[in-house]
Amino acid sequence: MAKFLNTSATNYFLEELIKGAQERLVLISPFLKLNDRIKELLEDKNRLKIDVRIVYGKSELQPQEIEWLKAQSYIRTSFCKNLHAKCYLNEENAIVTSLNLYEFSQINNNEMGILIRRDDDAELYKDTYEEAQRIIRISDEVRISMERVSSTDSET
């Protein structure tokens, strides 16, 4: 049976979901500005070569997000226009929530969500997983790149 999550529980179970990923991790959020704790957890998944897919919907990624993502070889990013869904899942659990992967939201907003455990509610988990896969399919995979431009022209 699904479990209701308030703001603090949503943040807690999101961290647990990321930590618990053994094979794959899908993070779907319109806004993407990761806090240091989430980055640390994702870096660990990257080191373990876990397949991580992040789908976001607002194209204005900050330069520090771009640099960080470029350094993570097992984290793939996709852009999905008109994305409003927020869904986070691994092979065992899914969270459907109002919480964006946005540092401000995780600290300042009142959020809620639902935790779905595959073992407890296989059909609901399957439906959530399939919709997440559909969103991934309609998204454009983005190869993160950023070119540094010198603030002054170099003289020759």
Q: Model regions: which residues?
A:
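PLD/PLD-like phosphodiesterase catalytic module centered on the HKD motif
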Residues: 1-156
